[in-house]
């Protein structure tokens, strides 16, 4: 697609869902660019996201729509949506309220590999108590 060809193209006309009807969605902090999470969207969740401007995903484990923040209050206000060159991955840039991670961290990518190439260390801040919010331990 040439740069000038994108003007009248609609996202829902070009998006390429996989054989299961899903597309990966990378979510970044709108202001810092920090990667917050990777989730999946189906047609319905993408349509909800476009309409409501709040991130809505498809839960593969529960097989249902997942409005991020509906349980925790940690909503993601969608500021920008991009699609990659193959139209098979979505990028959401959001204003994150609270933490994105269900275990209480700001980002789901809260562990990093150390220089020994095997040890993990915490590299993010805990922003809420998952047991208090969800009523059970979600730590992994």
Curated annotation (Swiss-Prot):
Pathway recorded for this protein: Amino-acid biosynthesis; L-histidine biosynthesis; L-histidine from 5-phospho-alpha-D-ribose 1-diphosphate: step 3/9
Q: Which cofactor does it need?
A: Mg(2+); Zn(2+)
Q: Which domain of life is it from?
A: Bacteria
| MF terms in GO | magnesium ion binding; phosphoribosyl-AMP cyclohydrolase activity; zinc ion binding
The free-text cofactor remark is: Binds 1 Mg(2+) ion per subunit.
The residue range of the signal peptide is none
Similarity comment text for this entry: Belongs to the PRA-CH family.
Give the protein name, as stated in the record. Phosphoribosyl-AMP cyclohydrolase
Protein source organism: Chloroherpeton thalassium (strain ATCC 35110 / GB-78)
The encoding gene is: hisI
């Amino acid at each position: 697609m040439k740069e000038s060809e994108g003007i009248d193209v609609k996202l829902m006309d070009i998006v390429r869902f996989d054989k299961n009807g899903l597309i990966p969605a990378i979510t970044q902090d709108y202001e810092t660019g920090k990667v917050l999470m990777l989730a999946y969207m189906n047609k319905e969740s993408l349509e909800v996201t476009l309409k409501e401007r709040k991130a809505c995903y498809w839960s593969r484990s529960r097989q249902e729509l997942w409005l991020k923040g509906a349980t925790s209050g940690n909503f993601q206000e969608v500021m920008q949506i991009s699609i990659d060159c193959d139209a098979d991955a979505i990028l959401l840039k959001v204003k994150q309220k609270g933490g994105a991670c269900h275990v209480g961290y700001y980002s789901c990518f809260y562990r990093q590999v150390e220089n020994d190439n095997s040890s993990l260390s915490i590299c993010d801040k805990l922003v809420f108590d998952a047991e208090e919010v969800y009523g059970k331990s979600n730590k992994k």
